[in-house]
Amino acid sequence: MSAQPISDFYAYPDAAGHFGKFGGRFVAETLIGPLQELSAAYDQARQDPSFIAEYDKDLKHYVGRPSPIYHAERLSREVGGAQILLKREDLNHTGAHKINNTIGQALLASRMGKTRIIAETGAGQHGVASATVAARLGLECVVYMGATDIERQKINVYRMKLLGATVIPVTSGSATLKDALNEAMRDWVTNVRDTFYIIGTVAGPDPYPRMVRDFNAIVGREAREQMLQDYGRLPDAISACVGGGSNAIGLFHAFLNDPGVKIYGAEAAGDGIATGRHAASIAAGRPGVLHGNRTYVICDDDGQITETHSISAGLDYPGVGPEHSFLSDSGRAVYQGITDDEAMAAFHLLAHTEGILAALESSHAVAQSIKLARELPRDALVLCNLSGRGDKDVHTIAAREGIAL
């Protein structure tokens, strides 16, 4: 916890990209120049009304924003306690929140004169969103994806290929998201002249954590306005799943300076934190450096990154965005582990009560929201970010339950 309370969370990051003691730019010298170029281009673009107007236009007419807030009445009655509200990011074009960020970064890539974009992906949603915007803007697209994730997300792999992207399997390490990110970084260093790296989460070296946050902040801005318009007040609590944490910070950011709104992040506890087979970086990790920033990471006593586990490919990452580490240490947000079994139970309950198939990532937040609702009175409001739809996970769920498709 911070020694002094934070009076304005919007003062972060500082000019060097630090969120308190987290964040920064811990990279090889060969990347300093490209990152400085990117930072300058982004700072210029975000002050340009024509860039903002183009981004807003695409969010409305291409992505389909605003996404609605849906009152899950039957789920709320089944659970008992508070009313559960869902911010429906699953209804966006491509089926998740990821498109909010890829649209922004792809427009920036075009503005910078880049002709090739690369991306890393875990669950495949960021890869699909990157391939989608590349096709729309006429850019070459290469997606790095861990071989383990390719096996459990075959549908999204094929979707990327249908959109014209090249998908490169990564077999090093645990062959999951962190390894895909490593390979994408190597590609960027080699091809920086014509290549733009679209990072899919609020991790990486500055300016990525703030840039990805800013492009996803539309989620929270909309939600805040919708809550005041439809319910006349802000929610009592908000919840979102946290791997790297882009959907979560997108929701959280608009509420950071509202002390009456409690903020909760749902991390992947996998088989249970005590088993060691999890991906709960804040709940069970320690500060370290990963992928160019200082944050909470899952590592051994020597500081070496260890393998993680989650039924959800998108949460199977041994780190977390530095702003989340900062929010945790400051006490502004609470991060809790949700097991595979709890996420699965929430997936089925939401499907049966509301007719909505949530992504396994999002199901962690649904499970957390259910727990929160049971502890609150019936007139309390819990807003859950339903960050993506579950079509991509049907084969994983069926296999886990012994059903052959």
UniProtKB/Swiss-Prot annotation:
CDD domains: Trp-synth_B (cd06446). Its cofactor is pyridoxal 5'-phosphate. One of its GO terms (cellular component) is cytoplasm. It is an enzyme of class 4 (lyase). GO terms for molecular function: tryptophan synthase activity. Keywords: Amino-acid biosynthesis, Aromatic amino acid biosynthesis, Lyase, Pyridoxal phosphate, Tryptophan biosynthesis. Tetramer of two alpha and two beta chains. HAMAP family: Trp_synth_beta. The beta subunit is responsible for the synthesis of L-tryptophan from indole and L-serine. This is Tryptophan synthase beta chain.
